[in-house]
Amino acid sequence: MIKAIEGVVTKKEPAFAVLKTNSGVSYGIFISLFCSAKLSKGEKVELAITQIIREDANLLYGFLDANEQKMFEMLIKLNGIGASTAMAVCSSLSSQAFTNAIISGDADTFKSVPGIGPKTARRIIAELSDTKLISDESVPSYQNEALLALEALGFKREKIVKILPDCKSENTSDLIKEALKKLG
């Protein structure tokens, strides 16, 4: 099983790249639009790989971001979601937007992705709402602590997730106070 490939980008399209390794082997890898925007032809990169082996193909999906890879892998495990639909989600939503949409039950966010209709959007939310979602390491721990404290006070997670990004405080107690004012 291939877990990562390091090489030079020899070809780049919006959703596909070719990496040539030091050994001279070139790999065709499907990538998201976010990943494509960060790659440059001639650049040496390492992509984390999710390999999908089918009867008729051996497909490689590459990621610069671990959260994007986790999001992709969560989606392809769902019934009726294939790799191309999962990659469309990765190309349309950041990992934070993905997590927020599931937590808040926002089907419209998923319906905005090409190839996802209302039933599929609801199914994604229903099937992933109980799973441990992506933890964004860029989210400071004080925000997570504030989220847990506000939930303990009885506020709904969906409402908390919507207002926390607007709060400017940078420590747990001040963030809780600011959030309480916004939550009413």
From Swiss-Prot:
Pfam families: HHH_5, RuvA_C, RuvA_N
Region entry Domain III, spans: 138-184
Residues covered by region (Domain I): 1-64
Cellular component annotations (GO), alphabetically ordered: cytoplasm; Holliday junction helicase complex; Holliday junction resolvase complex
Signal peptide positions (record): none
GO molecular function: ATP binding; four-way junction DNA binding; four-way junction helicase activity
Chain intervals for the UniProt region annotation (Domain II): 65-134
Keyword check for Cytoplasm: yes
Quaternary structure (record): Homotetramer. Forms an RuvA(8)-RuvB(12)-Holliday junction (HJ) complex. HJ DNA is sandwiched between 2 RuvA tetramers; dsDNA enters through RuvA and exits via RuvB. An RuvB hexamer assembles on each DNA strand where it exits the tetramer. Each RuvB hexamer is contacted by two RuvA subunits (via domain III) on 2 adjacent RuvB subunits; this complex drives branch migration. In the full resolvosome a probable DNA-RuvA(4)-RuvB(12)-RuvC(2) complex forms which resolves the HJ.
NCBIfam families according to UniProt: ruvA
Protein's name according to its UniProt entry: Holliday junction branch migration complex subunit RuvA
Organism: Campylobacter concisus (strain 13826)
